[in-house]
């Protein structure tokens, strides 16, 4: 089975990671509606090969949030910190808005009480107006900020630059959404190696430590996240192949089908609770006031509802408490798990729909399924688990994967495989498919509306990546539309099946040029399409194919052959006619021409004769994308402008972080120094007047810090800190030397004592060492001792608050210099013993004796032969 697939070889075992000479790392990003998780594949020594990166709060997942407050941009945890106070300034669920039309997004944010100020941009997509009232960001720009944030988390984790990533996407993401994420990555300055469907990441993680050589299996991955639910059917198996002369088993999996429910998720359950508690609070408040109309109140309520739902997963009842929910009124209540399940009654049966659909369309029964693996945070709800368990008829659900991290870890393996800097050993074949089928349709002045110009291009679940080719009989310029195959299965918010449009030109010119020639076949347009590993379909190029047949003069051959002059296959030859020569010259730059003639043996020429030759010209056509709508790509100008905006924000963020760091350093220095100045150690090495003046300076800067310096820039903080250090550093240095200097003195004296023994050992056991070298070492040691004795005596006469006569650093420097000289002398090798050379006379005598012995032996042999 494995032979029929195109293979993506993927890491299965962490110990199979093989480093290349240079350090390299890649990351995966699980971009959810509410959370973003980051995993890093890093071959750096001392670090786990694959690990989840923690954020600034040491958490393994970060809020997928962007906020703007007082001119500053906040990301992740920082943005989450102001959600309750400024809900209109914190932008969430951005993944669910990318590539969507304005009306769809407007309806969505209203349904979940998100108080965003949105506008419709020129593409019909959403622009989000931030709190300054004038700046508008596209969803792609805001997603770029989150991807940049994820990249920074990875770099902080890996301690090296990380720009190559794989981003997981839900299977129902259409072309507009996938293109939008790719554009966001371009704006973020990161390189997306591929988008990967979430179920493929989970399936890869599932297959890491399993062997399917003894039996294949079907596994369903059931994922309920915040905003959607899907079920993916995956078939695991193994095949055998030869590797280095041995038969090895290779595991593989193929995604057979995936079905989803776009409006069902953990958020659906939370909104039932929100509505329930909003009604309850309205009754308490009275006067016809509806808390739903107040964004800040709803933000507080939604935040607490999340906690209440989590408590209900482990307890049969849960409290909810919101201080100052609205109009200075606190809200407190409780809810039982039974009541919660009743509020969500219709959701439980609905949760089975993806499971039922995937079984129905695959023709399998639940008994054919080896496991139903649950992933996604919402699958922790007990009622959901019991509903699924009852449907599949098993005593226990399959929970072998980490519900939160399976996708990001599996995607990290995918990223490692795609990276040029990481080599993998163990293999797992992956065949994922397109969740949508696609059509291609041609339009133009002479394009007939029939099956020949509107046809299936990509069937549903076509493997990723793939190349497609279609040929059309046309002689005029035309337009190409790419559309979803079924209007019954469309991405969320899609109003038209058509998602991409192209104009193809150059065909009319080519047709006009060659129409007067003897065409042997109708002019055709060949179109080349690709379905990328990210699941994005595009028209890559087009060619005009023109075939002509012409009579030409060719040399006669003195042979008897079939006089039939019909076309046959052969290699290209030059034409003799002037007309054909001109055509060849004209088309040389823009076309590929091939000639076909009959193959004949080489014989003597008897003049010329007429023969037919077939020539094929392939002329590149101009393909220009003209897609409109929310999924339209940014123009070059828009892309450049967006990059400038984001770079300015990045620069401002760096300056803000630097300012905050320097402000914190200044504040910490003031508090730490004041505390030190009151210690006995500092009293020893400073005068009372010196300490008093320094404390006054510290107080002065501290007052400035909390008043005029509250909004100062980084340069101001750095300048103030340097001015304090100029006073404090000499005092701190004297304090440090008070401890360090005696240690250095003791070290030096101990070494000088040891050196005397070393010199004695040299004189006794290493007699080959030159005496002058030993004397040099002895003299240098004496110099060090004299310098040390003199300065120690001088230091004892000097007050501790004065500048030290000498420092510990100077002591170590002199000892280390002496040690280097000792090492060099100690390494002088012992001379090799002299070997006495054999004199020439002795050699000659030996040779003569050997020669004489040989002659006598030869004579003795001769005498035996005679006998």
Swiss-Prot record:
Residues 1-24 form the signal peptide. A motif (Prevents secretion from ER) lies at residues 865-867. Residues 560-607, 829-867 are annotated as: Disordered. Coiled coil: none annotated. It comes from the Eukaryota. SUPFAM superfamilies: Actin-like ATPase domain, Heat shock protein 70kD (HSP70), C-terminal subdomain. Residues 833-867 have a biased composition (Basic and acidic residues). One of its GO terms (molecular function) is ATP-dependent protein folding chaperone. Keywords: ATP-binding, Chaperone, Endoplasmic reticulum, Nucleotide-binding, Signal. This is Heat shock 70 kDa protein 17. The gene is HSP70-17.
